[in-house]
Amino acid sequence: MRKTNVSHLVDHFNMTILSGEEGLGREITVTDLSRPGLQLAGYYSYFAEERIQLFGLTEINFFQTLTPEERLERMNFLMQSQVPCFCVTRNQMVPEEMIDVSNRLGVPVLQSPLATTTLVGKVTNFLENRLAPTTTIHGVLTDIYGVGVLIMGSSGIGKSEAALELVKRGHRLVADDAVEIKQTQGGQLSGSAPELIQHLLEIRGVGIINIMTMFGAGAVRNVKNIEMVVQLELWEPHKMYERLGLDEETLKIMDTEIPIITVPVRPGRNLAVIIEVAAMNFRLKRMGYNAAMHFTRKQSNAILEDADSDL
């Protein structure tokens, strides 16, 4: 399970540390946030202590109505051992009881100028990105007409050369050789390049080239959602390859199924153009037009018409 900690949250959102600074190393393991209104009212049967606790205008104003003894009681309960931190929105003033218990138990209290709803959205997106399951796959990720295409195949089969030709044709490179893939909670896969090899492409016989330096900033992008996979393999004469495109196969990456097509490689085939057309065909299918199904219907209608004319 991936983790992050409170200090990463503070740095990313430039939050103010009000108290409990010694707890900045506390781990954050879930993306959900909690607004502990019921617990402030004295309901202790359930408390999501693994979540970041958020105090907006409602929570602070209600907390102010409690007696000093009740405030201490509520804070001692809320600042349990697994609570990562407390975030106070809109730069509100924080009650002394919260500061005192925070310093005593080492639970950070952070302050942000953002509105509560805005902070919830931003922190949730940040945590989903930091805590998303990750894997690394050998391949090349490109952006072709807005479609994220992951090109896979054995070493030396021509993935990088195809990517170079695609860049020359106006498409964009995301990652070459190693593609880091993250899976969001919705099952979407996003790919990027490790920082060390970002924007770099290796061509056998030429060496390593920097795509952004050579072709400009418009030829690269840092992150792209993966929508289809193209598997390159050496042509096998006795193997049956898909010719109509009616049967759709998928590849499982982590828990997500991605459409995959297999393209046989042999001398004289322009791989870049084939991959480009595959991406355009994918877009057409997504828009509701399937050329293979359209052809099949026309063929079936023609057969029926011939059968009727013979009667």
UniProtKB/Swiss-Prot annotation:
Active-site residues, as the UniProt record annotates them: 138, 159, 177, 243
Catalytic activity: [HPr protein]-L-serine + ATP = [HPr protein]-O-phospho-L-serine + ADP + H(+); [HPr protein]-O-phospho-L-serine + phosphate + H(+) = [HPr protein]-L-serine + diphosphate
Residues given in the record as Mg(2+) binding sites: 160, 202
Protein residues bound to ATP: 153-160
Gene Ontology BP annotations: regulation of carbohydrate metabolic process
Keywords annotated in UniProt: ATP-binding, Carbohydrate metabolism, Kinase, Magnesium, Metal-binding, Multifunctional enzyme, Nucleotide-binding, Serine/threonine-protein kinase, Transferase
Cross-referenced InterPro entries: HPr(Ser)_kin/Pase (IPR003755), Hpr_kin/Pase_C (IPR011104), Hpr_kin/Pase_Hpr_N (IPR011126), P-loop_NTPase (IPR027417), Ser_kin/Pase_Hpr-like_N_sf (IPR028979)
Cofactor: Mg(2+)
Function comment: Catalyzes the ATP- as well as the pyrophosphate-dependent phosphorylation of a specific serine residue in HPr, a phosphocarrier protein of the phosphoenolpyruvate-dependent sugar phosphotransferase system (PTS). HprK/P also catalyzes the pyrophosphate-producing, inorganic phosphate-dependent dephosphorylation (phosphorolysis) of seryl-phosphorylated HPr (P-Ser-HPr).
Protein name: HPr kinase/phosphorylase
Source organism of the structure: Brevibacillus brevis (strain 47 / JCM 6285 / NBRC 100599)
